[in-house]
Amino acid sequence: MSPNPSSFGKVAVLMGGRSAEREISLMSGSGVVQALRSQGIDAHAFDPAERDLGELKTGGFARCFIALHGRFGEDGTVQGALELLGIPYTGSGVMASSMAIDKVMTKRLLLSESLPTPRYVLLRRGGYSPAQVDAIVDTLGLPLIVKPAREGSSLGLSKVTERAAMAAAVALAEKMDADILCEQFISGDEVTCPVLGTGEQARALPVIRIVAPEGNYDYQNKYFTDTTQYLVPCGLPAGEEAAIQQLVLQAFRTLNCRGWARADVMIDQATRKPYLLEINTSPGMTGHSLVPMSARAAGISYEALCVEVLKTALLDHQPRDGSLP
């Protein structure tokens, strides 16, 4: 049964923000505002880069749909502010958000539960020598991936195919983060799988297989070209897809995520073993975004998806009577 639109109260769609992914967030948020309004919900755009978060309280907002991406949006920062304001919000809580945005912490948590993720080496700004950078090639082999530990949308990511390119790749990643993740490259199918819900009620949506030009699924190919192919149904054997969905649900629960998320996975071409790369706790909602695409394959329209996500808005610390403000 669909909830009465008025039961949501006045909704702020947080969008824009201060991260390197601001442009994408504005695109996501605009789509969400339009979708919620089409369902009769009193939704308003709210850019934390231009307005004080305190206005959410004084403005009478009852809950927030977080369409922010990257720093200050999906890293636990805005979630903590909303906890203090007592305004329920979509997506994961403070701790899960801060863990999931950090690719190294995510890997450590996954490995603690024996979930597969590519081998890696962590570099910290100012804490490594050229010789140590060079040695990473011997440790992980070529090609390998170098990326900032806490950025999304493939920003600052390099695929290193020769030893001489390592220093430049590390320097690029270091411009965006003090922590640099050097990761084993898994050659094979690149897939992604969204999750909707919380706890035991969480469910995995259809897997999407991504085929990018020259295998390069970078920022440009993610959002601004039509040459990347998104295959859903993914074309994998049913058993493989089910195994990926189960693995993604395990990862979602390991990080204590809630509401919704999307996990990126590589499938080793030789062994067909899936490897978890990262979990995005505030996925994109643009025209090129993958969660709406997967939801559509499951029979869920963009508008219905936005309402479904909004219904999951919570606080880490609920009032004693379990009610929402």
From Swiss-Prot:
It is found in: Cytoplasm. Keywords: ATP-binding, Cell shape, Cell wall biogenesis/degradation, Cytoplasm, Ligase, Magnesium, Manganese, Metal-binding, Nucleotide-binding, Peptidoglycan synthesis. Belongs to the D-alanine--D-alanine ligase family. Cell wall formation. Its main location: cytoplasm. It is an enzyme of class 6 (ligase). GO terms for molecular function: ATP binding; D-alanine-D-alanine ligase activity; metal ion binding. Binds 2 magnesium or manganese ions per subunit. GO terms for biological process: cell wall organization; peptidoglycan biosynthetic process; regulation of cell shape. InterPro entries: ATP-grasp (IPR011761), ATP_grasp_subdomain_1 (IPR013815), D-Ala_lig_Van_CS (IPR000291), D_ala_D_ala (IPR005905), Dala_Dala_lig_C (IPR011095), Dala_Dala_lig_N (IPR011127), PreATP-grasp_dom_sf (IPR016185). Gene3D superfamilies: 3.40.50.20, ATP-grasp fold, A domain, ATP-grasp fold, B domain. Residues 107-311 form the ATP-grasp domain. It comes from the Bacteria. Mg(2+) 1 binds at residues 264, 278. Pathway: Cell wall biogenesis; peptidoglycan biosynthesis. GO terms for cellular component: cytosol. This is D-alanine--D-alanine ligase. Mg(2+) 2 binds at residues 278, 280. It comes from Polaromonas naphthalenivorans (strain CJ2). Its cofactor is Mg(2+); Mn(2+). The lineage of its organism: Bacteria, Pseudomonadati, Pseudomonadota, Betaproteobacteria, Burkholderiales. The keyword Ligase applies. Its EC number is 6.3.2.4.
